[in-house]
Amino acid sequence: MDYGENMSYNDCAVDGYCSIDPIMYSLMEVLLYELKQITYYYIKMQELGYENKALKSRIINYLSLILIGYEFNREEFQALLKEIHKEKESVKEAYTAFCDEKNMDCQILKSNIKFEKFDLSSIVNQGEQQAIRRNSSLSADVKNLYEIILNLIKSASIRLIELKCYTEDYLPEEDGILKLFNNLNFSAMTESKLIKKVNDFAQINYQIHKKLHVFKEEYYGAIGLHDVSIGVEKGKSILVSGQNLKDLENLLEAVKDTDINVYTHNGLIVAHAYPKFAKYKNLKGHFQMSMDSVQYDFTTFKGPVLVIRNFQYLLDKLYRGRLFTTNLIAGKGMTRIEKNNFKPLVDAAENSQGFDRDHSIAQVKVGYDEELVMQKVDKIIEKIKNKDIKHLIVVGLLNHAAMHSQYFDVLEENLSDDHYVITTVIPSKKDNILYFDSFFNSSLIYKILSHIKKHVDLDKFPVSVFITTCNLHTMSHIFNLKYLGINSIYLPECTSNIITPNMLKFLKEKFDIKQVSDDPKKDLKNL
């Protein structure tokens, strides 16, 4: 299952080899610039003993926008830029006033973006100029490190936003995100220092991922193994796609007294693994006609679509007008749901064509029995200790990979007896392959690797991980795995809007990341 690809914020628009809307690119450049400055002043005030939790939370929300997932509504985006600039000036003014009062020599950042005349043409032009300045002032390697940092911040912010849906406790990871981002304010930061910052942040990033899993299980119940229907039932319907379970829950609460059927889409299928969602009679199952085309799924669904927070696909114009979103900014043709007022969405569902008959496609399993899984993992650990296993291979953090199954067929055929595979994508009954025929997020694989690490010295025992799907969180997964002690990481062939060829080359050279070849035998030999 592909969990969503994002439009990477990189230099392709400046270099002219990818199709990002140049106006949106320029606006994003201004957003990035203003966010760097507001983060700088926020941290300075924090160092002086002033804390503004609401502002910190808003900055984290803004940071979730720094990589484009779809074409934003420009008017809303302009309004957001204006709001961020106003907040930046306010915290800058407070910092300057404090410095003057205490007669301190405080560093004020130079601002290249002028907001005196706030109109689209002026801001776009300044964004273009800022992109040129940024690209000309940084070396290729430092630009790649900036790109990695932005990817990690985006991924971490998304997860932190969802995490904050379940707790009001202080989360030190928020400060970790802002401190990493603040490093981008200093052009003198060397490559070696940035690499260290990235590696240090891996622990924070992993803790966010781990905490989110724990809090969701506390709130929705422990993940279990469940059967889920793929298809539709007769009636009016709403399709929900994205990543934020709290948004799905809020919708289900809003429609619980109606006859509207609700279906999950794409990676949101994991909601069915949590017991709390079973109580909602309106949640009928999962709708997905294509494993690789959101466009097709949305156009064939006979009802409105709710794009919940952190949905990351580029959207076609064909179904604009019946798309709704809980995101901070709506995409073109979308209606934004504000303050959990789902009435416009419910009205759209009531007025939609709906499905005139039941249509069942399949039954699939979602989730896992953790106790049973760990019993099997303990047996693997014993085999490792007894030296029956010489190399452990993990194939797929997510299920149903985009990589061609023929590659894995050959890998399975040529797997030696002293190699063991834990996989979510190779349906095999071989004694040295543990296959999970179920949909779930990456939390299970992380749990397995973390458990193995407690009993096996990963500095001495070889473990290789094949990431089989490229998406918004791929960069995050790379450094989570490295934090867990996995040094042999293989990537599939990612599209350039996820990982550019230049970035892949950089990851290979600086972090020893590998890419699968077209020869599984060779890859096995080189493990």
Residue ranges and their predicted role:
Residues 2-53, 57, 96, 104-106, ...:
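Anaerobic metallocofactor- and corrinoid-dependent redox/one-carbon enzyme cores
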Residues 41-219:
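Electropositive, gly/pro-rich neighborhoods at or near active sites that engage anionic ligands
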